[in-house]
Amino acid sequence: MAAKLEVREAMLTEKRVCRFCLTEQKLASIFEENPRVKTTANLPLQIMAITAIEVYAGDGMPGHICLECRLLFEHCYRFKQMCKRAETLLRQYPLTGNWPSPLEKPRAPMTMVASKKLLVVPAKTAEPSETPKKLLNTMAKSSSQVIIEDVQVLESAMVTPRTVAGSSPVPRRSHAYELKVDNNQELSMDDVQSMLEDMASELEKEFPDIPQKASPVKPKVLNKSSIRILNKGPAAPVEPRLATPKVKRDDSGNVAIVTEVLDSDLPLDDQDDPTKNAEKVATDVFPCPDCERSFPLQQLLEIHRLNHTRSRSFQCLLCEKSFFSKYDLAKHNFVHTGERPFKCAICSKAFTRKALLHRHERTHTDVPKFICVYCEKPFLSRQEMEKHAERHQKKRPFQCGVCTKSFAFKQGLERHETVHSTNLPFPCQHCERSFSTASKLARHLVAHAGKRAYPCKYCHKSYMLSHHLSRHLRTHTQTSDASFVCSECKVSYSNYNDLLDHALIHATASLKCPMCRKQIEDIDSVESHMDQHKQSERHACEFCDHIFLTQKCLQRHIEDDHVVEMEPYQNEFEDDGEGEGGVDEKEEHLDDFEDMDNVKQEEFVTEYLEDDALYEDHLDDSDESFTPPPPKQRKTNPPKDAQQSVRQTRSRDAQRITQKTGKNEGKPHHKLERNLKNRRSAK
């Protein structure tokens, strides 16, 4: 059985079939860029954004896509970008007062390949010059999404010469007007319309002008249903694709349009419909129907969807933005005040959120850590460690009767006792555990989700959720094959230097760089500033078209201008945090989940769903609970003061180092501490 499975998996990988419609014609690789197709983003990213399906080389699936699906993905992606752009402009209107101008809609995809023919055959008529031109122009104006294959316009050789009053006899002619298109050449609707109009002009030159009065009777359309099919617009729920449309006339001059509708668009019987008889299979990707996100477990998706029905009841007094919780609103207020209350103890760099500070502190790998004697948690500064130690020294008279935890307040004990209850409102579907809040359940579900299912193909990072990967992939495409868009006028360029040359025009006019929004002192400094963009590394924003000179400038821009966009990534699966320090711990774990590699699965906190203000567990138990350590491993008597805690930490660290490397190896640790003190005193 295992051998058959391996054989089938190998056949699936090598099968030359379109991964999305299962056709075997006109295939191309998903992972190789087609130079004839101008795209707004690479194809795997478009597929992820539209279908929530991640494709990458070596994923065990067919690696091909047909031409029609390729164009449809490009069209859908452009449409999605247009919708998001419209949403942004509409939300900016209350703040700016500038009503946005209409956006340009993406053109419908059109493919033309040379295999079949479109025949326009005029029969006997008194006006051989008028009918072909009218028919072609009508088709050029009305056809919206017709797959035309190798167009030929033929004049019948059986035209009978007739003499019309005031004109010369029409000679007998036998000409063929043929327009061939190379295989797999992509043409837009404008190209097709122009092509048909040119063909009509050629026909007009071949025939002399005939007075209008010579044709009092207009030809009758015999099959109006075919006309309706040709003219069917994009608003139709299911638009049939047409192959080989033919325009014919009978002996009386009446017009008939004969079309062949592709079999895949005809109504199917239930027994022939693959979707009716398809067996449902389990999948590890559960896309949200209300947004572009997807999740590895169905229950995570259900928790996420709760936020689509929640109301934003906390409104900012300085602008019109609203938030789910007081904590979100407090974070947003930093944008207006400019306050950055969380400072690094090593380099004094300031941040608006403690989670960003914790992420930054991990970069100081060469600085000795101060270890808490109670829980062995490391800190970069003695002050932080002493403040943390005070929490362990609190009197906690309220002890749980089931476990060893104790609490400083009775309310904390009552909240904790719900943990031991077997009738909690949020049960896990994969085990017998249940939880008091949806956020705690979501964090527990990470253990069931297994490994991170979405690895990046360009670097070593991997992600638990598809939209985390999608957001990360934009950082690669901004510096590779993606088009570069001017933030001022939205003109796009395929080359970064071309964009900079264009941006120089805007910067000269306004003395403000359109790339990084920096105000330039004078016109003489404009060119030198743009040269810095050419020579320095590019730090592209994931949410807009700005590109900055340094990572610091980019981070400041995101914190100031994209607070709303960052909310879905910062707040999912998070408790309200209105209690004493509860949010800080969760934010720190969230950063580990999204940015760190090779971390134990139990330490992950899944991506935020928005603050869990729906539920009442506002305090984290770790803030006021304390579990006495086992007597063999830790000291049961707490130190009398914080200074004694520091001395014990130093002594214990020195003993550890001595045991591992020798008696004299403990000295460098204290030497680093002295260097750290000198650095602080110098500052």
From Swiss-Prot:
Gene behind this protein = pita
Q: What is the effect of changing residue 79 to S?
A: Disruption of dimer formation and reduced solubility
Q: Does the keyword Chaperone apply?
A: no
Domain ZAD, chain residue ranges per copy = 16-93
Q: What is this protein called?
A: Zinc finger protein pita
Superkingdom, according to UniProt? Eukaryota
Chain positions covered by the region annotation Stabilizes interaction with Cp190:
95-165
Region annotation Essential for interaction with Cp190: residue ranges? 220-232
Query: What is the documented function of this protein?
Result: Insulator DNA-binding protein. Chromatin insulators are regulatory elements that establish independent domains of transcriptional activity within eukaryotic genomes. Insulators are proposed to structure the chromatin fiber into independent domains of differing transcriptional potential by promoting the formation of distinct chromatin loops to form topologically associating domains (TADs). Recruits Cp190 and cooperatively binds to chromatin promoter and insulator regions to exert transcriptional regulator and chromatin insulator functions.
- What more does the record tell us? A pita/spdk mutant was first identified in a P-element insertion screen for mutants with a mitotic phenotype. The highly condensed mitotic chromosomes characteristic of the mutant resembled the pieces of fruit in the British dessert known as spotted-dick, after which this protein was originally named.
Kindly list the GO CC terms recorded for this protein: nucleus; polytene chromosome
Query: In what ranges is there compositional bias, type Acidic residues?
Result: 610-624
Q: What is the effect of changing residue 48 to A?
A: Loss of protein stability
UniProt: Zn(2+) binding residues: 18, 21, 66, 69
List, alphabetically, the PANTHER family matched. GASTRULA ZINC FINGER PROTEIN XLCGF49.1-LIKE-RELATED (PTHR16515:SF49), PR DOMAIN ZINC FINGER PROTEIN (PTHR16515)
Q: Which UniProt keywords apply?
A: Chromatin regulator, Chromosome, Disulfide bond, DNA-binding, Metal-binding, Nucleus, Repeat, Transcription, Transcription regulation, Zinc, Zinc-finger
**Spans of biased composition, class Basic residues?**
668-683
Q: How does it assemble?
A: Homodimer; disulfide-linked (via ZAD domain). Two dimers can interact to form a homotetramer (via ZAD domain) in solution. Interacts (via region between the ZAD domain and the first zinc finger domain) with Cp190 (via BTB domain); the interaction is direct. This interaction is not essential for protein pita function, probably due to redundant recruitment of Cp190 by other insulator DNA-binding proteins whose binding sites cluster with those of pita. Interacts with ZIPIC.
Organism of provenance:
Drosophila melanogaster (Fruit fly)
Which intervals of the chain are annotated as region Disordered?
A: 610-683
- Gene Ontology BP term (one): regulation of DNA-templated transcription
> Where does this one sit in the cell?
Nucleus; Chromosome
Q: Which SUPFAM superfamilies does this one have? A: beta-beta-alpha zinc fingers (SSF57667), Glucocorticoid receptor-like (DNA-binding domain) (SSF57716)
Alphabetical list of SMART domains matching this protein: zf-AD, ZnF_C2H2
